[in-house]
């Protein structure tokens, strides 16, 4: 399934409400540009794990640095070949799957090994600490955990699934 948005604000809303595996965004968009969208996403614990590719017609070092510094996993200048974009998408998705596979094979590996960003690392440490502290609590529920993490149960599910491949 492919989701489309006419601007960065709509895209951010779509990403927060749907399960998304990858973002491909143009830099030049109305209301919220691609740099802002990427920065917002990479600083939002609910969606920071989603790989992000920025596309641009700007051919200068400052623009490229701005894109990568906003958190983009890849930055491609237009015009680009569809083969190159396909390879980039494949590599990002494959590395995410390898990370998930590694965790599935070694479920007791340090949770920090799942983090793809500092935001994810903080999230995973907080989640792990809470679970270790409350594991003996018979009343522990997904709702309590989501509340502690400051997100809805569906956002918590998407985040954990996105980072670990587990539900």
Would you name each region that the model predicts?
Residues 142-167:
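Basic/polar phosphate-binding segments, predominantly the helix-turn-helix DNA-binding elements
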Residues 80-89, 93, 101:
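C-terminal output helix
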Residues 29:
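Receiver (REC) domain active-site loop signature in two-component systems and cognate sites
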Residues 4-22:
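Acidic, metal-coordinating helix/loop segments flanking the phosphotransfer/catalytic sites
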Residues 76-78:
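A Lys-centered signature of the CheY-like receiver
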């Amino acid at each position: 399934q492919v989701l489309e948005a006419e601007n960065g604000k709509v895209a951010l809303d779509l990403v927060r409400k749907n399960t998304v595996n990858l973002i491909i965004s143009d830099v030049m968009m109305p209301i919220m540009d691609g740099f802002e969208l990427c920065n917002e996403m990479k600083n939002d614990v609910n969606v920071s794990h989603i790989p992000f590719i920025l596309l641009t017609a700007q051919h200068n070092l400052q623009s490229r640095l701005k894109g990568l510094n906003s958190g983009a996993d890849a930055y491609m200048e237009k015009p680009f070949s569809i083969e190159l974009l396909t390879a980039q998408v494949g590599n990002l998705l494959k590395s995410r799957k390898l990370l998930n596979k590694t965790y599935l094979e070694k479920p007791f590996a340090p949770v920090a090994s799942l983090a793809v960003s500092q935001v994810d690392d903080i999230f995973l440490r907080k989640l792990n600490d809470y679970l270790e502290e409350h594991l003996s609590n018979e009343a522990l529920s997904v709702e309590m955990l989501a509340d502690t993490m400051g997100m809805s149960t569906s956002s918590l599910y998407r985040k954990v699934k996105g980072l670990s491949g587990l539900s």
